[in-house]
Swiss-Prot record:
GO terms for biological process: actin filament organization; cell adhesion; desmosome assembly; homophilic cell adhesion via plasma membrane adhesion molecules; negative regulation of cell migration; negative regulation of p38MAPK cascade; positive regulation of bicellular tight junction assembly; positive regulation of protein localization to adherens junction. Residues 639-993 are cytoplasmic. Residues 1-23 form the signal peptide. Keywords: Calcium, Cell adhesion, Cell junction, Cell membrane, Cleavage on pair of basic residues, Cytoplasm, Glycoprotein, Membrane, Metal-binding, Repeat, Signal, Tight junction, Transmembrane, Transmembrane helix. Expressed in the basal layer of the outer root sheath of the telogen hair club, specifically at the cell membrane between the apex of the cells and the surrounding hair club (at protein level). Expression is less abundant between the lateral margins of the outer root sheath basal cells (at protein level). Expressed in epidermis. Expressed in the epithelium of the tongue. This is Desmoglein-3. The gene is Dsg3. Homodimer. Part of a complex that contains DSG3, PKP1, YAP1 and YWHAG; the complex is required for localization of DSG3 and YAP1 to the cell membrane in keratinocytes. Interacts with PKP2. Interacts with CTNND1; the interaction facilitates DSG3 localization and retention at cell-cell junctions. Interacts with CDH1; the interaction is required for CDH1 localization to developing adherens junctions. Interacts with RAC1; the interaction is required for DSG3 translocation to cell-cell junctions, organization of cortical F-actin bundles and actin anchoring at cell-cell junctions. Pfam families: Cadherin. Residues 845-876 are annotated as: Disordered. The lineage of its organism: Eukaryota, Metazoa, Chordata, Craniata, Vertebrata. Desmoglein repeat repeats lie at residues 905-930, 931-961. Its main location: membrane.
Length: 993
């Protein structure tokens, strides 16, 4: 046990040694390695020293052959074998050739020629040792042969003459120039070290300069250089090598003294004076001479003249003559003797260049007085002010400038100070011919529009010259006008509507402003309506919403149609477009979805603003046709017979005069008061008549209007049924003497939506009085409890408290409710008589009742009409002649129109009451009212033809107003009525009015 421990310890130590050895063999060194990675140990070889000796130095420009051999080469291999020595390089096999040679057997190198160091400072010789096979046994060596320098080259200056300059009054030790010289000898050697010195100075005298020995810098020695005394210096400088003891060379230096502004200019005179006529200009009134000692024709010598006082009105200018340095006094603004007789001002002078710092503190402004005497002369005309600026008003387009008046620019009489007379104005310079001036009033206006590409516009301004020529003296005065024109907006913003159609219930729409050039013409935009030339009511308004939109809305209720709304848009630079933009807007009736119910017709009656239109071929043709008709009208008038009678009647031989006393009312003519008024009786309505349960007009009222030659029946719907009368052949017997040869009747009916034009005619007031009296009695007898308010009230106003269904005369009064009857108080006897006739108190009129007369040459007018329903239907039978057939007790009214004198008779009263005859089949009790007119109307007599099934119980009442002898008072029953029974004829003839 005791020996195991030592054994184990020894084995462990042996193992560690093996591991250490194995680890050393595999360490990777930084040197060479085998393929297995182990280090390769190289044996170190000891080399011998160089096999050539150093060469001896050679001196230039000497014979160095006595020093041969200058070098020797020897190889250790020559002991064992034959060695051959060879050399090569510059001076051997390169130029210069043959300077060095070698002995091939022993290796001695010899020099054979004189060398120059400046050409070849040193020689490099390549030495080789070769065996018998011509192989190098030694590594080739380089042998250096140095050439020693000798002082054989003098210094050389870079220039023969050096030129320099320096300002006068410069401080001492100021650098003037640096001289440059070189030496070809060995650098950094005494042979090439140069020393400089000044040999001489011209002009001689006090030395003004010095030079640095080593650097060659020439500097000032003093600060007293003065160009005005000596303007340049000439120096001779030498340079010697070997630090001044060797070879030397000389050069020249030319130094110019530069001028500085160290001399003040001084005027030669202490004061100046001159004379000049008023209102004249002078380019050279005076010359000022100045003395300056600085260099001529330089800024230091050139004088600058200026005013120190007295030229506040800028009447004078001083210009310097560059050749003589004199100041030239010019009169650039005319002097007025009436304002100033003498001008005093002061001038001073300085140089164009600033004064030198050495004397600037000594400068003082010296003012010299100048007096100008103004000579009085007879003055002419001039423009005051000499220029005038006009501005085109904002909003005026550049293409609407023709005729635009800018204003006037008149010349002034200098003697009176007022506008000159006997002056003719013309335009001198007028680029583009845009303007024109009135030769008498000097009014200026545009005659051409401005093009945006015009080259005559400079900074938005047009300039022109105005000449005023005195017609007495021939003198001319010139003035300049400037016209500021509106700016052009080449990128006008456009206005876009949110929608084209709007509703009448909400007439508004949003406008949006857009532009293509976003970089220049940006918002905010201002949208406004174009100002209307006429004083029209404002229909639209614009309210700004934001920078690019606005609200267009109607200010009042608008009707459907198409509207053109011109608007003006301003950009952010307040620029306007040349023309306003017109927006087309359609206003329509909308449904619940705010959509137009029906399209708006293409016609635009409600166009707002200006609309473009043109004449078509049809319109042009109509215009030409109208002109042709105007030319033919005089020819047609020559063929007209103005005295012919009415249609269908005999000629009367001329116009029938209106007889006196035929008027039935009192009119206010021009000599009595205001304009005549229409006093005809309004419509008297007839209530519906019922026969066998059938209404005539189906719950509508029937109103009759009597016109010349026809009867009109009005319904509640506003339509008029017109019955016209005409002659027919082959008819039955005539009715009375009014037939005048007619034997039949023809009935024509049609309806129209309007009314015929009424012609005012006088009314027989006597008949109306009796009629209304009888009607009042009839109402009183029919219904006792009914209030009697339908009596003869010519000027009465029944008021608004009448019963709704009670008959009134408010609508049948021949006078208006607001008629003032005070004018009756001033009427004469003639009108008093007429008033008695109208009131029914004229006894003479009642007693004068002439008998009926036969038909004469005059034309009787019989306007009879009768509407009788046929049994079993609601058809009507018309009896020509304005015959009113109504039910007994019903309301009757007859409207009088046209050129007729008409009267109406009712069934009640004391005249001829209607007789009711019962009829078992149809409703009887009819009243036939016949009306005659004999005032000259040309209505034709008619024949009454009854239907075979007409009512048999008829009461016929006849009343004739017969102011003419041709009126007839008899009635002849037609053929159909002669066999009838229960027929009552009543005749009443009125007296002449």
């Amino acid at each position: 046990m005791t020996c195991l421990f030592p054994r184990a310890l020894g084995s462990l130590a042996l193992l560690m040694v093996v591991l250490l050895v194995q680890g050393e063999l595999h360490v990777k060194p930084g040197g060479q390695h085998r393929e297995d990675g182990t280090a390769l140990q190289l044996a170190k070889r000891r080399y011998k020293r160089e096999w050539v000796k150093f060469a001896k130095p050679c001196r230039e420009r000497e014979d160095n052959s006595r020093r041969n051999p200058i070098a020797k080469i020897t190889s250790d291999f020559q002991k064992n074998q034959k060695i051959t020595y060879r050399i090569s390089g510059v001076g051997i096999d390169q130029p210069p050739f043959g300077i060095f040679v070698v002995d091939p057997n022993n290796g001695d190198i010899n020099i054979t020629a004189i060398v120059d160091r400046e050409e070849t400072p040193s020689f490099l010789i390549t030495c080789r040792a070769l065996n018998a096979l011509g192989q190098d046994v030694e590594r080739p060596l380089i042998l250096t042969v140095k050439i020693l320098d000798v002082n054989d080259n003098p210094p050389i200056f870079s220039q023969t003459i050096f030129k320099g300059e320096i300002e006068e009054n410069s401080a001492s030790n100021s650098l003037v120039m640096i001289l440059n010289a070189t030496d070809a000898d060995e650098p950094n050697h005494m042979n090439s070290k140069i020393a400089f010195k000044i040999v001489s100075q011209e002009p001689a005298g006090m030395s003004m300069f010095l030079i640095s020995r080593n650097t060659g810098e020439v500097r000032t020695l003093t600060s007293s250089l003065d160009r005005e005394q000596i303007s340049s210096y000439h120096l001779v400088v030498s340079g010697a090598d070997n630090d001044g003891t060797g070879l030397s060379t000389q050069c020249e230096c030319s130094i110019k003294i530069k001028d500085v502004n160290d001399n003040f200019p001084v005027l030669r005179e202490s004061q100046y004076s001159a004379r000049i006529e008023e209102n004249t200009l002078n380019a050279e009134l005076l010359r000022f001479q100045v003395t300056d000692w600085d260099e001529e024709y330089t800024d230091n010598w050139l004088a600058v003249y200026f005013f120190t006082s007295g030229n506040e009105g800028n009447w004078f200018e001083i210009e310097t003559d560059p050749r003589t340095n004199e100041g030239i006094l010019k009169v650039v603004k005319a002097l007025d003797y009436e304002q100033v007789q003498s001008m005093q001002f002061s001038i001073a002078v300085r140089n164009k260049a600033e004064f030198h710092q050495s004397v600037i503190s000594q400068y003082r402004v010296q003012s010299t007085p100048v007096t100008i005497q103004v000579i009085d002369v007879r003055e002419g005309i001039s423009f005051r002010p000499p220029s005038k600026t006009f501005t085109v008003q904002r909003g005026v387009s550049t293409n609407k400038l023709v005729g635009y008046i800018l204003g006037t620019y008149q010349a002034t009489d200098e003697d009176t100070g007022k506008a000159a007379s006997s002056v003719r104005y013309v335009l001198g310079r007028n680029d583009g011919g845009l303007l024109v001036i009135d030769s008498k009033t000097a009014q200026i206006k545009f005659v051409k529009n401005i093009d945006r590409d015009s080259t005559f516009i400079v900074n938005k301004t047009i300039s022109a010259e105005v000449l005023a020529i005195d017609e007495n003296t021939g003198k001319t005065s010139t003035g300049t006008i400037y016209v500021e024109v509106p700016s052009f907006n080449e990128n006008c913003p456009s206005v876009v509507l949110e929608k084209k159609d709007i509703c009448t219930s909400s007439p508004s729409v949003t406008l949006s402003v857009r532009t293509l050039d976003r970089g220049k013409y940006t918002g905010p935009y201002t949208v406004s309506l174009e100002e209307q030339p006429l004083k029209l009511p404002v229909m639209w308004t614009i309210t700004t919403l934001n920078a690019t939109s606005a609200l267009l809305q109607a200010q009042q209720q608008v009707s459907p149609g198409v509207y053109n709304v011109p608007v003006i848009v301003k950009d952010n630079q307040d620029g306007l477009c040349d023309t306003p933009e017109s927006l087309t807007l359609t206003v329509c009736q909308c449904d619940d979805r705010s959509m137009c119910r029906a399209p708006i017709p293409s016609r635009e009656p409600n166009t707002y603003g200006e609309s473009s239109w043109r004449l078509g071929p049809a319109a042009i043709g109509l215009i030409l046709l109208g002109l042709l008709m105007l030319l033919l009208a005089p020819l047609l008038l020559l063929t007209c017979d103005c005295g012919s009678g009415p249609i269908g009647g005999a000629a009367t031989g001329g116009f029938i005069p209106v007889p006196d006393g035929s008027e039935g009312t009192i009119h206010q003519w021009g000599i009595e008061g205001a304009q005549p008024e229409d006093k005809e009786i309004t419509n008297i309505c007839v209530p519906p008549v019922t026969t066998n349960g059938a209404d005539f007009m189906e719950s509508s009222e029937v109103c009759t209007n009597t016109y010349a030659g026809g009867t009109m029946v009005e319904g509640a719907s506003g339509m008029e049924m017109i019955t016209k009368l005409g002659g027919a052949t082959g008819a039955t017997a005539a009715l009375g003497p009014c037939s005048l040869g007619y034997s039949g009747t023809m009935r024509t009916r049609h309806s129209t939506g309007g009314t015929l034009k009424d012609y005012a005619a006088p009314v027989n007031m006597t008949f109306l009085g009796s009629y209304f009296s009888q009607k009042s009695l009839a109402y009183a007898e029919e219904e006792d409890e009914r209030e009697v308010n339908d009596c003869l009230l010519i000027y009465d106003d029944e008021g608004e408290d009448a019963a709704p269904h009670s008959p009134t005369l408010s609508s049948c009064s021949i006078f208006g409710d607001d008629l003032d009857d005070n004018f009756l108080d001033s009427l004469g006897p003639k009108f008093k008589k007429l008033a008695e006739i109208c009131l029914g108190i004229d006894d003479e009129a009642k007693q004068a009742k002439p008998g009926p007369k036969d038909s004469g040459s005059g034309a009787d007018t019989c306007a009879r009409s009768m509407e009788v329903p046929q049994s079993g239907s609601n058809r009507y039978q018309t009896l020509p002649g304005s015959l009113e057939v109504t039910q007994t007790g019903s309301k009757i009214c007859h409207t009088l129109s046209g050129n007729q004198e008409t009267s109406v008779m009712s069934t009640s009263g004391s005249v001829h009451p209607a007789v009711a005859i019962p009829d078992p089949l149809q409703l009887g009790n009819y009243l036939l009212t016949e009306t005659y007119s004999t005032s000259g109307s040309f209505a034709q007599p008619t024949t009454v033809t009854f239907d075979p099934h007409v009512t048999q119980n008829v009461t016929v009442t006849e009343r004739v107003i017969c102011p003419l002898p041709s009126a007839s008072s008899s009635i002849v029953a037609p053929t159909e009525l002669r066999g009838s029974y229960n027929m009552l004829y009543t005749k009443e003839t009125c007296s002449h009015l």
